[in-house]
Amino acid sequence: MGNTTEARTIYILLTRSGTWFSRLIHLATADSYTHASIGLDGPIGPFYSFARKYSHFALPAGLVEEQIGPELRTKRQQVPCCLYELSVSPEIYASLRRQISAMYAQRQRYHYNLLGALSCFFNLPLDRRDHYFCSQFVAGLLRDSGALELSKP
């Protein structure tokens, strides 16, 4: 058994898939990456985020488990991505795991916050109960668990 006081590693995966919605976000923001996911089980996943539930349809969208591999390749190109590692205490890691597990167990309750994502373009944050967009979900988990102190732009 390992030492339970050792730091644990979580992973933040940023991607830009080339879907029409990703291209729209990229055009509006000029950000290199347009999607965020969080993983707790190593650099190859699984990762959790708010995204489309089916690869060929933009809707419905909600809380999904993402596997890297096929998702990081399309028929046209490889998907640009960036993987960050963050060391956290065992308590924060456990808190993140509990939060993600609880939400994923009730994933039908959660919906994609399309209005919230669109309102970001106008710097007007829109929080809706049980609605998230990808970076809102990841940032909320990091903030609520105490993993990072995040300020709003």
Roles of regions detected by a PLM:
Residues 1-153:
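Cysteine-nucleophile amide-bond enzymes
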